[in-house]
Amino acid sequence: MRKLLNLLLSLVCALWLALPCAAATRQPVSQDYIDKYFTSVAAASCLGVYLPEDSTEFNYLRAYGWRIMPQKLRSGRVETNFAIAHNYFPELKKRIFLVTFRGSANKKDWSINLRTHRVNYGGSTLAEMDALAKEPLRKGEPAVHSGFNAYVDTVMRTSVLDDKGQLRGVFKAVAERSDAIMILSGHSLGGAAATLLGQRLLDLGMPPERLCVVSFGAPAVGNEAFANAYGSRLRLLRITNTADPVPGSLQTFFGGYKQFGQHIKYSLSPQISNIQHDMAMYFDYSVGDFYNEYDRQVALGRIFPMSDRKMTVGKPMVALWIFESENLKKLATIMDLKRFVTDEYKRMLPSYMVMDKSLGKDAYAHQDIVQKSRFAGADYILICGIDGYRQPQADGWYLTLDQALFDEQGRMLTMSSLGRKVLPAIGNVQAVGESLMAARKELHAQLPFVLVQFEPELWQK
């Protein structure tokens, strides 16, 4: 049962990105709701960009309509790794372009981080920017980290500007289309690159209302004069946590740097970790943060929660039984994993009914579950279990997901059991995401009506 549980956990990842949100709206949802939704999407992309060719997170986003194009480009000694994605959201009547920069992953990346001396910042063309950066540092004037500046310069030359120094590609499209918004995002080095590129794009004429930056655990990019002169121009959601030393590292060890932007700090208990910079942790928190805002919108009557019963004409009814172990309840997971799993299954099944939600592990024998499901009108019975197992004298725990599918007579059609080790502060949603992809694929093979591709939406109609 433990392994079956982990598969369920995987469903968590899918769930939140799919937004199990509202069935209808009464009033417009808050900007916080929209911000937190896209923050969680950006967090998934920040994980995916580390392994762009074999990424569960990218595959999950693609299932929800995101078109993703990984990029790996080089100019001189600098190599850039990022991904460009886009999707259309009818609720906003906007096409969202998401550009995600990878954090530090090798020695070349760290060589960029360690080029901590500053260069002048300014100019409205690439030529002006380059010329100013080569001049002797001007005291009291805006200046930025030379390594980050070189990284962004490479991105601009290879992907942002044409031979005439004009915006091209998706950057040109966003600048010219009133129905487009660009989100620049990244973790650590990637977050610094996203922030500095955002400022460069504004200098090159990008309308500020069409641009937002979401950074996770990113160091400062410039000095106090830079923050004061340019910080208010760029909409920056700067996300850190109470145990991450990286955002303050340049100020602490080198001095002369200053952060700016809307600071969002996740509170990480010292009992979980004293130092935590991993992107997987930020992913967990961003999903949990979104769900908190979702619940707030429900309480305000702006959206309605997903029903525990749904019927689609012509689609078989599936009785959904979800079990959560007592062990899992005792673990310091950031989110309610059972809720994530349940919501994700709701998304996959055109017709479903959630059975006794308070059901304990040994509440009913198998024949009782079959009888109750048949009495309720089910054509199929899907039983899932989530568990968390801590090994003695070991860090972290194993999250397991078990999934078993039966016909209405109680005959087993398929069963899966998956598991993955995670650390106390990281990896819960990521582990669930990996299991989800396998679980959904197996269910679809048995039941072709199970959905594997979804329309992007901020809330369900």
Regions found by a protein language model. Name each.
Residues K310-V318, F375, F406-K461:
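C-terminal/domain-edge helix-coil "capping" segments
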Residues L8-P20:
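Bacterial N-terminal signal peptides
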Residues P28, R95, T125-A133, A143, ...:
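Serine hydrolase/lipase
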Residues A220, I303-M353, F449-K461:
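A structural "domain/chain start" motif
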Residues E79-N81, P90-D130:
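Short, surface-exposed "cap/lid" segments of acyl-processing enzymes
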Residues C21-T25:
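Boundary at the C-terminal end of the N-terminal hydrophobic targeting segment
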Residues Y364-L413:
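Surface-exposed short loop/turn segments
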Residues G186-G190, A194:
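Gly/Ala-rich beta-loop-alpha elbow adjacent to hydrolase catalytic centers
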